[in-house]
Design a protein with these regions (language model features):
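Short, conserved, GDST-rich strand-edge loop motifs in beta-rich repeat architectures
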Residues: 37-42, 224-246
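Beta-rich catalytic cores
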Residues: 49, 111-112, 158, 208, ...
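N-terminal regions that are enriched for targeting/export leaders
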Residues: 1-103
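Structural core positions within WD40/WD-like beta-propeller blades
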Residues: 33, 54, 124, 172-174, ...
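Beta-propeller blade signature
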Residues: 51-55, 183-194, 234-260
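Beta-strand initiation motifs
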Residues: 61-68, 139-145, 192-197, 212, ...
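Well-ordered mid-protein domain cores that form the structural environment of catalytic cofactors
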Residues: 73-195
Length: 260
């Protein structure tokens, strides 16, 4: 790992107005959550650092509270006292060669380190290839994996970049189902909390689809010419990162999926 990526420590700090130089404007108040990789002890790629959630709370009385906690994922528990990686990540292989990595090919090294969102009274921390983890908003303690009350297909990972439409109170997200035919799975969460699969859209090859855009009518996917070569990954020879190949001759495909 690049030595510039230092492992972060957890903080719980509260400042009163007397502790602050100057005065915070009265209309600047509220809570903001942030997430990102922060523990790089075992990571061979910055995307594999364990996720740390940070909460900054500016109260109406001018006090400021900052809290940061690691998401206590299965990955973090497994690797807590280990000197070497125990779970494959985006760019991290476990020791022991291809056979060890092949046996772990389907384990999801969910680091819960990419983004954070609010869903009702829940705070969810997201990762690109697995279920969200639910956190307690008061102390950021980890409750566990969250599947929207059993509605999220365990076989289809959800993206870490959902899109919310404030005019309809609907949340859209996607996952990639890599199989004999690769499919983009688009799903919608309505204002009542019901999750519906909107479409399963076949695409060529095994594209690396990271994000999408949302309009009033469409979910818009830019499917670029970057593919994941599944064979070297599934046989334990390479990580996901090292299995991504660029095929510029294919160009970029724009896939439109109706929200309805």
């Amino acid at each position: 790992m690049d030595p510039r990526f230092n492992t972060a420590v957890e903080y719980d700090i509260t400042l009163t107005p007397e502790d602050i130089d100057g005065v915070i404007p009265e209309d600047l108040c509220g809570v903001i959550f942030r997430n990102g990789p922060a523990d790089f002890r075992l990571a061979e790629h910055e995307f594999d650092g364990d996720g740390m959630i940070r909460r900054l709370n500016i109260a109406v009385d001018g006090s400021v509270a900052f809290l940061s906690r690691y998401a206590e994922t299965a990955k973090r528990r497994i690797e807590a006292d280990s000197p070497t990686p125990k779970v494959r990540g985006f760019g991290t292989q476990i020791p022991g060669g291809p056979l060890h990595n092949m046996s772990a090919a389907r384990e999801r090294g969910n680091a819960a380190n990419t983004s954070v969102m609010r869903h009702g009274d829940c705070i969810l921390t997201l990762w690109e290839a697995g279920k969200p983890y639910q956190l307690n908003p008061s102390d950021l303690s980890t409750i566990g994996p969250y599947d929207f009350e059993g509605q999220l297909d365990a076989k289809i990972p959800s993206s870490a970049h959902p899109k919310f439409d404030p005019t309809t109170n609907e949340l859209f997200n996607c996952g990639i189902d890599y199989g004999k035919t690769t499919q983009i799975v688009t799903f919608r969460l309505d204002r009542t909390g019901k999750l519906t699969t909107v479409a399963r859209t076949p695409v060529a090859h095994a594209p690396f689809v990271h994000d999408f855009a949302l309009t009033s009518k469409w979910c818009v996917y830019l499917v670029g010419p970057a593919d994941i070569s599944l064979r070297p990954f599934l046989t334990g020879l390479k990580s996901v990162n090292d299995s991504i190949k660029w095929h510029p001759e294919r160009g970029t495909q724009i896939v439109l999926v109706s929200r309805d």
